[in-house]
């Protein structure tokens, strides 16, 4: 599943013309959408619209975060964000670890000049 999901995340950035961002969910700046992998994936799958103001909320009311937690599980989702953001693996839960590994892989591919760890 991780390889397919990584490919889908990369495709989401490419087809939607997104720029990756860390430690935030979404920032619209000068006609460019800077988004985290969860927002990229949620928009790519048609779950949320890129104009939805809730995807810019850094917290629990973020529509993309809520969707990802329901779809992939909360631990996996947190792990993915931590890995992408360059955070050290904080838990040993298998779902968290899988998400963290995917986040690191996504950051390595999408941000080659700024490796996550």
Question: Which residues does each predicted region cover?
Answer:
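Domain-length accessory/inserted modules outside core catalytic folds
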Residues: 1-35, 41-117
